[in-house]
A protein has these predicted regions:
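Bacterial N-terminal signal peptides
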Residues: 11-19
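Residue-level hotspots at or immediately adjacent to binding/recognition sites across diverse folds
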Residues: 22-235, 255, 259, 266, ...
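Solvent-exposed coil/turn segments that connect beta secondary-structure elements
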Residues: 100, 277-279, 325-327
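Short, solvent-exposed beta-strand/turn patches at coil↔beta or beta↔helix junctions
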Residues: 232-268, 276-297, 351
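Periplasmic OmpA/Pal-like peptidoglycan-binding modules at the C-termini of bacterial envelope proteins
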Residues: 260, 266-270, 282-289, 301-363, ...
Length: 501
């Protein structure tokens, strides 16, 4: 398999690189323990009730308040690794996760933390999110398809991570040794990052996972089993049919492809997938085992014909995904995998030859939250907002009107929600995501806001972010006050102009 990423593609990059360019980092409180006086970047927050909340972030920082955010104490986490996620099951029990397989557990309300061992310890994968389902049950997600479950308070963890099978699209790209592992039934983990897991506050048996490449999952048993969700773009095109041994497309097909490309031109999170097909007769006559190159040339020509129309319509090549491309170097695999060519031919077989053109969902997703068992929201890179009305089975896009990365969201209902993100983004909607705006009670900031969470009941909540920024609301998010830092003219200066689009 490809070399592991030292920091998972984009998520960790946004957590690590962006803050470094904006300020000097300090990791220890001035004067030792006690009230915070220095700015650790904060990535996540968990709110137990109107009094108790915990925030976590850079260099092993875990901060705790038990007076509704008036004062905060830096607790002993026993690590200097970055902590990306934190979740409390109740006032006493919770977990925090982070860099290099870090899993911490508390049983005293976050005052002290103990390291827990998982099956990922020797793999060094980054853990990006944790959801405490109960004092004994929790779910963790991270890079390389990491999906862990404990039902005994973290004494043991079940590894339910995403793996590759022989019919998985990534199988053909594995190294030969990894392919052999798959055939033997050994686990080879999928090269995908899962960024967030969350469960419904009122019933934590209903949970959801999201990640890169539009990976979506839902569970109705507290994370013991998962089912895939899907994004419905509403943009489709009929397959481009071609005759036997033909590569040219008709004027009508050209117009249809052009209209299809124009429909997604401004939606940068959508790519176009091109997948050529061949008939049984073509495979038999042109794809002979001792010389499959004539068939490869037909397949390649069909792909190029359609791709040229898409590019002429204004779609850059980096947004075009070529699936089922001819394996020109197939001879390198035959000795170790005698069925390689047969599998490829079977994957191209269709009744009517031609090319399938489809939407390839490619949003990089950061956070998922549900207001109830049906109404859910997802945020992502480039201002992506997704909505579900059926418990996460299907999702559709909503228009935020901004292009910043949206790191967090809190829904109060199916109509009302608040999102936070980079460059001080704090927006709200009261019409189910049809329109978004900066409400009158929102502060004007220029720092990165990472996470948002509210206490059960929804009145008291916090936003956390860069340089130990902590905002507090007591009125369901309508108005916010700065809890930490007490003053910072760089971060709190009023904007002279609207924030950059």
């Amino acid at each position: 398999m490809a070399d592991r990423r030292s920091v998972s593609r984009l998520f960790a990059a946004l957590l690590l690189v962006l803050p470094l360019g904006c300020h000097d980092l300090h990791f220890d409180p001035v004067g030792g323990s006690g009230e915070i006086t220095v700015p650790d970047d904060l990535f996540a927050v968990s709110v137990v009730d109107s009094s108790i909340a915990l925030a976590a972030g850079y260099w092993g920082a875990i901060y705790r308040t038990e007076d509704g955010g008036k004062t905060w104490q830096k607790t002993e986490s026993s690590t200097k690794r970055l902590i990306y996620g934190i979740s409390m099951a109740d006032a006493m029990h919770g977990w925090a996760v982070g860099q290099l397989s870090l899993v911490l557990h508390t049983s005293d309300g976050g005052k002290t933390w103990q390291r827990q061992s998982t099956p990922k310890d020797d793999q060094g994968v980054h853990m990006f999110s944790v959801q405490a389902v109960s004092p004994t049950q929790a779910v963790i997600v991270g890079e390389w398809g990491t999906r862990l479950l404990t039902e005994d308070g973290g004494k043991s963890w079940q590894d339910n991570s995403l793996t590759i099978s022989e019919d998985h699209p990534q199988f053909v790209w594995l190294t030969v040794p990894d392919q052999e592992k798959v055939r033997r039934g050994d686990a080879v983990f999928e090269d995908v990052t899962l960024n967030d897991v969350s469960c419904l506050t009122s019933n934590r048996q209903f949970c959801w996972i999201i990640g890169e490449f539009a990976y979506l999952f839902r569970s109705e048993d507290g994370g013991k089993s998962w089912k895939r969700g899907k994004i419905e773009s509403g943009i489709e095109i009929q397959p481009i049919d071609m005759g036997y041994n033909e590569i040219a497309i008709t004027d009508a097909d050209r117009e249809a492809i052009t209209a299809f490309a124009h429909a997604i031109a401004d939606q940068q999170h959508l790519n176009i997938a091109i997948e050529p097909r061949a008939s049984e007769r073509e495979i038999k006559e042109f794809g002979k085992p001792d010389d499959p190159f004539p068939l490869f040339e037909i397949i390649e020509a069909r792909t190029q014909e359609v791709q040229s129309v898409i590019e002429d319509a204004g779609i850059l090549s980096d947004r075009i995904r070529r699936r089922g491309a001819p394996p020109w170097d197939y001879e390198e695999f035959i000795d170790d995998d005698p069925e390689f060519l047969d599998r490829y031919m079977s994957s191209r077989l269709t009744e009517v030859p031609g090319v399938e053109v489809t939407i390839s969902q490619n949003p990089y997703l950061f956070a998922v939250r549900f207001a109830d068992q049906n109404e859910g929201w997802i945020t992502g890179l480039g201002g992506v907002i997704l909505r579900s009305h059926d418990g996460g089975r299907t999702w559709t896009y909503e228009e935020l009107g901004r292009v910043q990365a949206v790191f967090g969201i809190h829904p109060f209902s199916g109509d009302t929600a608040i999102v936070v993100g980079e460059k001080g983004l704090i927006y709200g909607t009261e019409d189910g995501g049809k329109t978004w705006s900066q409400w009158a009670g929102f502060p004007t900031l220029f720092t990165f806001m990472r996470g948002i969470a509210f206490a059960p009941g929804g009145r008291v909540g916090y936003i956390v972010g860069q340089r130990a920024m902590v905002l507090r609301s007591e009125d369901e998010g309508k108005n916010w006050t700065t809890v930490l830092p007490e003053s910072d003219p760089v971060l709190l200066a009023e904007a002279e102009a609207p924030a950059e689009e």
